[in-house]
């Protein structure tokens, strides 16, 4: 694995370069190509987020529910896109249980 010298995050290969989510890029040299190989390609899949009331153990934050106007919601982060993209922030209203998401 290659780590970003700027922010310390894991860098991912893309288009002949290692790319970091912070924007740093490093060319993949022939020496590095010999060091790494792709062992498996995985396709993105949909996931079920919650199936019960287990959300009640999550932290809360002050944010307005777009459905009922309540000013408190549970929140959590989940990787829903490619690994080199930022996580998605989910909210669930503490009053009406409406769930919505925010992308960075």
Swiss-Prot record:
Transmembrane segments: none annotated. Zn(2+) 2 binds at residues 65, 68, 93, 96. GO terms for molecular function: DNA binding; DNA-directed RNA polymerase activity; zinc ion binding. GO terms for biological process: DNA-templated transcription; regulation of DNA-templated transcription. The keyword Transcription applies. A zinc finger (C4-type) spans 4-22. Zn(2+) 1 binds at residues 4, 7, 20, 22. Coiled coil: none annotated. Keywords: DNA-binding, DNA-directed RNA polymerase, Metal-binding, Transcription, Transcription regulation, Zinc, Zinc-finger. The keyword DNA damage does not apply. GO terms for cellular component: DNA-directed RNA polymerase complex. SUPFAM superfamilies: Zinc beta-ribbon. Induces RNA cleavage activity in the RNA polymerase. In its presence, the cleavage activity of the RNA polymerase truncates the RNA back to position +15 in a stepwise manner by releasing mainly dinucleotides from the 3'-end of the nascent RNA. The truncated RNAs are able to continue elongation. Involved in transcriptional proofreading and fidelity. Misincorporation of nucleotides during elongation of transcription leads to arrested elongation complexes which are rescued by TFS-promoted removal of a dinucleotide from the 3'-end. Belongs to the archaeal RpoM/eukaryotic RPA12/RPB9/RPC11 RNA polymerase family. This is Transcription factor S. It comes from Methanothermobacter thermautotrophicus (strain ATCC 29096 / DSM 1053 / JCM 10044 / NBRC 100330 / Delta H). The lineage of its organism: Archaea, Methanobacteriati, Methanobacteriota, Methanomada group, Methanobacteria.
